[in-house]
C-alpha cells in the first residue's frame, strides 16, 4: 500500500483520490481552501442557491464510470440526475429565438429549419457530421488515453475539410483554418455562427484562433446531452467528496502546500505552510502548472520536448462574471432551464474578452441565463433563483485580484460541506454597471425581470483562477495540455490545467488517467 499525497481537492483530484483509494493506496488530500470542488462552487443566501461554476453536466458517463469503479452504488443512487429539455433556448441579436431539444440531432435540425429558414438545419447537421469525424479521430487520444509521447501527431487538425473545386474542375481540400473560418465557410448564417462561436467562448476559446477541431464542443453537447443534478452541480462535488470519505481518503482543509519534497531524484512528500511535512511515495498535483513549478522551487516538471504551458497562460483564460438573482414570483412551468441571449455585436464582444484592451464588458454581451426547476435552489415555490453569467477578460475591473479573491475565500470549518462556498463582493461602480448590463440583456429571456428582483449578488471571477477548456487537436499542438506524468518520478499532474484539459467530464477523465498510470505503471495506455 503506497502513500499518496494529493495537492488540491478539485474534481479531477478527488476523482483520482477515490480511484487510488479503491486500488488499495493510502490517500491524503491537502486543500488550501475551506472546501472541496475547485471551480464547482455554490452561493447561498436566504434560502436561495446558485451554481457559480459549471451549470450543466455533459458526458455523464465519465462520472457513472467513476462511481461504478469506486463502489457498489451507481451515480444515480446518490444523485438525482435528469436531462434538461430543451437543452437551450437561444435568443439572437435580431430577436429570433429558437429552442433546441436535448440530444436529438433530428429535433435540432427541425427546430433550426422552422425558425431560421429552410436549409439552416441541414447546414448545422452537416457541420455536426464533420464534427463527429473529428470527435471519432481524437476521442481516445484526447480523452481516454494518457498524452502520447509522440504528441506532435495531434498537431494536425482532424476536422475534415470541405472539398473545393480548383482549376480545371479538379477538387482540392480547403486549407486548415480556425473555428471562425469554419463558421463563415460552412454555416452561412450569422445566427448559426453565433450558436457555434458562443459555445467555444463558453469553454474559454476565442473562435478566431481556436482550431477547427473545436467543432467537437457543440457536437459533444448535442450528442450526449445536457444533464442537471438536483441541488445543482455542487451536489455532484458533494457526492464525489462523500465517495472519497467512504473509501477512507483523508482530507485536510486550510492546508497550503508550499513545497514538494524530493529525495533520491523523485517526489517524496509535501511541506505545508505551518512547516509540517507529510511523506509520500507519490504526489499528485491538482494545481496550475506555474504553481506546480513554484512548489518545485523552479524545477520544470516537463521537459523541452514535452507539451509545456505558456508562461502567462493563466492571464489568457477568460473568466465568468456572475450575477445571482433572487426573484419574486414563481418560475413559469414552460421556462427553459438555460437561455443564451447572444451579443448585439459579436466582434466587439470577442475584442473585449480576448483582446489586449482594459478588460471591460462590451455594451451588450452574450449572457447565459440559468433557471433550474429545482426546489433546492429557492426558499419556496413563490420565488425563483436565476443565475446570469458572461465571459470576461481574466484581468481588469471585472476580475478580483488574487488578494481580494483570497479574502473572500470561505473560512475553514468543522464541516467543509456546510454553508455557502462562494462569497459575493461589494459592488464597485464597474461591477454594478456590468451587473446592470447582464440584467438588461437577460430581459429578453425573462420578461419583467427588473421588477421581480428581490436582491442580487455580484460574483466576479478571481484573476488567474479560471480553468482552460478541453484539449484540442490541431494548430500544431498549441491547444494540447501538459501530460499527467511529469519528468520527476513519482510526481503526477491532474485537473483542468493538464491532459485532457478543463471541464467537468475532462476533469473526471484526468483523475482516471492519473490513477491508471500510478496503478498500472507509466507505460499504461488507457482502458481498452
Model-derived regions: residue spans:
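N-terminal glycine-rich phosphate/pyrophosphate-binding loop and immediately adjacent elements
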Residues: 2-143
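A conserved FAD-binding loop/helix module that cradles the flavin
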Residues: 54, 496-519
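A glycine-rich dinucleotide-binding beta-alpha-beta segment and adjacent secondary-structure elements
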Residues: 189-203, 364-368, 440-500
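Mid-domain catalytic core of redox enzymes
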Residues: 258-380
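Active-site-proximal substrate-binding core of FAD-dependent oxidoreductases
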Residues: 520-528
